[in-house]
């Protein structure tokens, strides 16, 4: 494990970068600022290492990043309608962004300096204390995020937390993948399989789900067999028009509820790199990077629309306000414990 400086935050605190490697030539780097996944170096079919996630060279880029490159999102990922929810008869008001609450508002966990609990050659654990009322959520919530790089070429992200009151917790990682390399431009020729026969249609461009679980069959939302991301992204289909391309929740076909199972397979023919994604959560948000704001990232590379895609494990967005959905409620004294894995084949 290598530790080095990653720049200084706006309030004068030093951020650190931790680099892990395995026996097969893979490397990942993570930072204590926002518990971001900064880089994932994977050997391609010719043995050349490619960095397959978008990001920045120092903490400065992450402080102003609105796309959440590589971010640990908390307490709640995705959207809560009207930036409010009710729990045990009490209404909790959250900060509004985009007229709802997206990724827990402007003061997300990805804009904070985390503590490092432990670090070794294969894993780093970051810890954050989120006080009662933080972002509008109830309860003192202590959470850890552990990044592990295995010799099976898997990046494991394990979340563990507890709270002294019942609260909402729905954390995720917002990495943008480009299996040709972060500097390779469009991801539309890369292929995807999603283990999901249903998706969550949205009401309008604000991307709040209707509450319906709609079949993907016969629609451009069908990724049950391998398909290029760009094959139907511009189709004359209302759901894609509302969100400028894919940015939808998919309900995973789970064999056993709560078990870690395959959720997606993405591949790039040009690099020869394949990524398998696994989670124990019920859903995944597939986002094709439709609204990546033009920005200069790592090594001076210019990022733009659809230069990376996200596979964000989660509960159904706005489930806390939806009848009939599994709600992301962590009860006082219980342990929040979930794992998402991105495994690379090369």
Placement of each model-derived feature along the sequence:
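An exposed, glycine/acidic-rich loop-and-rim segment of catalytic or binding clefts
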Residues: 1-346
């Amino acid at each position: 494990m290598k530790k080095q400086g990653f720049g200084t935050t706006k309030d004068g605190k030093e951020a650190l970068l931790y680099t892990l490697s395995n026996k097969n030539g893979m490397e990942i780097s993570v930072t204590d600022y926002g518990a971001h996944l900064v880089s994932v170096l994977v050997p391609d079919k010719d043995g050349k290492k490619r960095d397959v996630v978008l990001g920045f060279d120092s903490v400065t880029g992450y402080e102003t990043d609105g796309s959440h490159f590589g971010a640990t999102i908390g307490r709640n990922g995705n959207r809560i309608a009207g930036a409010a929810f009710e729990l045990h008869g009490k209404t909790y008001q959250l900060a509004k962004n985009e007229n709802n609450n997206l990724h827990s508002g402007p003061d997300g966990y990805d804009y904070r300096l985390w503590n490092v609990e432990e670090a070794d050659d294969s894993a780093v654990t970051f810890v954050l204390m989120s006080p009662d009322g933080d972002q509008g959520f109830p309860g003192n919530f202590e959470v850890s995020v552990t990044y592990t790089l295995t010799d099976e070429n898997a990046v494991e992200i394990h979340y563990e937390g507890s709270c002294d009151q019942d609260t909402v917790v729905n954390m995720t990682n917002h990495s943008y993948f480009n299996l040709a390399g972060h500097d390779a431009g469009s991801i539309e020729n890369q292929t995807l399989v999603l283990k999901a026969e249903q998706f969550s249609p949205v009401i309008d461009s604000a991307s709040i789900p209707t509450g319906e679980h709609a079949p993907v069959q016969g629609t451009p939302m069908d990724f049950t067999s391998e398909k290029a991301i760009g094959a139907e992204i511009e189709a004359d289909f209302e759901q894609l028009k509302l969100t400028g391309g894919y940015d939808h929740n998919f309900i995973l076909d789970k064999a056993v509820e709560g078990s870690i199972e395959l959720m997606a397979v993405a591949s790039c023919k040009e690099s020869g790199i394949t990524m398998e994604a696994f989670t124990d959560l019920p859903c995944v948000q597939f986002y094709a990077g439709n609204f990546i704001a033009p920005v200069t990232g790592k090594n001076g590379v210019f990022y733009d629309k659809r230069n990376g895609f996200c596979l964000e494990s989660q509960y159904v967005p706005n489930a806390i306000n939806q009848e009939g959905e599994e709600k992301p409620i962590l009860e006082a004294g219980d342990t929040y414990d979930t794992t998402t894995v991105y495994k690379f084949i090369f």
